[in-house]
Amino acid sequence: MESTPFNRRQWTSLSLRVTAKELSLVNKNKSSAIVEIFSKYQKAAEEANMERKKNNPESLPQHFRRGTLSVLKKKWENPVAGAEFHTDSLPNSSSEGGHTADYPPAEVTDKPAPGVRADREEHTQPKPRFGSRPEAVIQSRYPRSENSHDFKAQATESQKMENCLGDSRHEAEKPETSENTETSGKIEKYNVPLNRLKMMFEKGEHNQTKSLWTQSRNAGGRRLSENNCSLDDWEIGAGHLSSSAFNSEKNESKRNLELPRLSETSIKDRMAKYQAAVSKQSSPASYTNELKTSESKTHKWEQKENVPPGPEACSVHQEGSKVSTTENSLVALSVPAEDDTCNSQVKSEAQQPMHPKPLSPDARTSSLPESSPSKTAKKFQAPAKESCVECQKTVYPMERLLANQQVFHISCFRCSYCNNKLSLGTYASLHGRIYCKPHFNQLFKSKGNYDEGFGHKQHKDLWASKSDNEETLGRPAQPPNAGESPHSPGVEDAPIAKVGVLAASMEAKASSQREREDKPAETKKLRIAWPPPAELGGSGSALEEGIKVSKPKWPPEDDVCKTEAPEDVDLDLKKLRRSSSLKERSRPFTVAASFRTSSIKSPKASSPSLRKGWSESEQSEEFGGGIATMERKQTENARPSGEKENVGKSRWQGEEVPRSKDRSSFELESENFMENGANIAEDDNHVHAQQSPLEPEAPGWSGFVDTTAAKEFTTQNQKSQDVGFWEGEVVRELSVEEQIKRNRYYDEDEDEE
């Protein structure tokens, strides 16, 4: 239509004529059947306008013509060949289509709907979509068929329609989305009888709805002026129709209007809009909330379009949706006072989307994070920073290990002694230091070495030899504890990271000490072998001596010299036990053997004490009754060595009883020498004085021994013991030494025998 300055007469109710050309522009890709069907209606409407023009020859220009429903009904039911005249008006209406291009409306597309009512419905529903209030939209769509001359008369009819529309407008919102899903090319001709339309217009109720119609008309005019729309309004009043018929027609009109844009929207958006419409119908009180939801839906819908409309069109489109809701509330409540308030709200809300739209591309989603910022902050709150006790680096949750009320890295949780990796089930701790269980038992439980854990001087330092070198080595080992403690306040004594260094220094000290003392390798381990094993022989004694040197000096060094002698005695006693059979066989010759062993110190420690157990009795017999014994031996010279041995045994045993006194007296004298501290020279003089009566017999005795030594000792494999045995004075001197040594441990020897 031509663009004309705004005139309130335009708001009466203008023609519903949307030209076929306009429809073809809007629905380029759709079938031409829509245009053909609509052109049929246009012909009927045009004829009705012509009749009205005849009745009112001085009427306003052609685009203000209006027709009554009765005439339209007749023309629709009985189409007359007036298409030529109707098409003459198409250029005029094409200008109307060009003016309303702001709102891409596929309006009224496939409504073969019955009569004017169907056309009116088709054009009312698009308007909530594309701009300004429903009245304004409707008026802008159909500007021509009304005659403003009959403004008041038409107003009454349109009031009826508005009243009916107000009741049914909520219902019209529901099928909004379902009809969108239908195929656009589907065309249906509705069988709604026009009698009902006629009845609706011919009924009264003019006074009842007049005030409401006036208010809505004025509000629509204001809204339309804001949107630069000079179109007139055609109010639809199909409220008295059955809801099913009205809804179906409404759906078809809505579908045709939204074809250009809704084809690009998703089903979800349309369903959301449908639910919003349902909620609007249910509670007018929730009007404000509904406006917000519809506004957000509109934002989202527009953002999903491939080619969004211009800012003016978008704002008009949003305003249209809001205006529809306000109009619904106004009509349903039929309260005139609410209209101005709602209009002001609509204006403010229509102005708002112009600015927030570019700012919030996701109007609905952006509002959600704002509503719950506190929850998200709590969820993602960073944990407190923790540092590892050992390496002093940050510990993150995935590598955190809490043990002994301290925080470690899993890889740093190691034994402070052997540096083996530990777990919560394999560690033991003492005052902040972590140990593996074997070393904890070895270092503390077996030795009672708890002082080491408390930072005191370690027992190993006390056990080691107290030399200056060791003390200098021991002192530097301690300062790291004091120097490193400030770095880790969580640990009581010293940081676990440095315990390995202490252990290494102690091991280095111990190894150097071992090298100086020729310690065997076993001494590194903290083992105690006490008392020494009794089964070891001569080779075992050397090993025991090595162990004694290598192990810690305990008991103190003052007692070491005392402990050596008992060990020698034990070794002698063990060897005597082993040679018990030899002692019995060689008893006749033990006097010489005892003197020889005392005089000659063999490298072995066992030789001087081989016959110690019975040498004392034989020596006493030698001094007390040596002559008689030797004479008997000479008489038995011719006998075999085995027989002599047996006889000698029996005789020696028989003679031991009467001669015990001599033996005891000699022993007392020798003990007196020891007690008085007499030197070896005095002992020798005393022995010579004591043995002087026996000297005349000595040559014979020695000769006897020389003759029999070769036989007796060779048979017993003792040649080495017989060589150089009788050397006179030397033998006697060393025999006293042997006696002194023997008398010291006399009681033990007596028990062994």
Swiss-Prot record:
Tissue: Highly expressed in the small intestine, including the duodenum, jejunum, and ileum. Low expression in the liver and very low expressed in the heart, spleen, lung, brain, and pancreas. Isoform Alpha is highly expressed in embryos from day 7-11 and in adult spleen and lung. Isoform Beta expression is highest in adult kidney, testis, lung and liver, intermediate in heart, brain, spleen, skeletal muscle and low in embryos.
Entry PTM: Phosphorylation of the C-terminal region by MAPK1/MAPK3 reduces its association with F-actin and contributes to actin filament reorganization and enhances cell motility.
Broad class of the protein's primary localization: cytoplasm
One GO cellular component, as annotated: brush border membrane
Subcellular location per the Swiss-Prot or TrEMBL entry: Cytoplasm; Cell junction, Focal adhesion; Cytoplasm, Cytoskeleton; Cytoplasm, Cytoskeleton, Stress fiber
Residues that bear Phosphoserine: 15, 132, 225, 230, 242, 263, 348, 360, 367, 372, 467, 485, 488, 599, 602, 607, 615, 692, 720, 735
SUPFAM superfamilies: Glucocorticoid receptor-like (DNA-binding domain)
Domain of life of the organism encoding this protein: Eukaryota
GO BP annotations, alphabetical order: actin filament bundle assembly; cell migration; cholesterol homeostasis; cholesterol metabolic process; intestinal cholesterol absorption; negative regulation of actin filament depolymerization; negative regulation of cilium assembly; ruffle organization
Reported impact of residue 602 to A: Reduced phosphorylation by MAPK1/MAPK3
Stretches for region Required for interaction with MYO5B: 491-511
Ranges where the LIM zinc-binding domain occurs: 386-446
Residues bearing the modification N6-succinyllysine: 437
N-acetylmethionine PTM positions: 1
Region (Disordered): 46-66, 82-186, 276-326, 341-379, 467-493, 505-669, 682-703
Domain-related comment: Contains at least 2 actin-binding domains, one on each side of the LIM domain. Both domains bind actin monomers and filaments. The C-terminal domain binds filaments more efficiently than the N-terminus.
Function: Actin-binding protein involved in actin cytoskeleton regulation and dynamics. Increases the number and size of actin stress fibers and inhibits membrane ruffling. Inhibits actin filament depolymerization. Bundles actin filaments, delays filament nucleation and reduces formation of branched filaments. Acts as a negative regulator of primary cilium formation. Plays a role in cholesterol homeostasis. Influences plasma cholesterol levels through regulation of intestinal cholesterol absorption.
Protein name in the entry: LIM domain and actin-binding protein 1
Organism per entry: Mus musculus (Mouse)
Lineage of the species this protein comes from: Eukaryota, Metazoa, Chordata, Craniata, Vertebrata
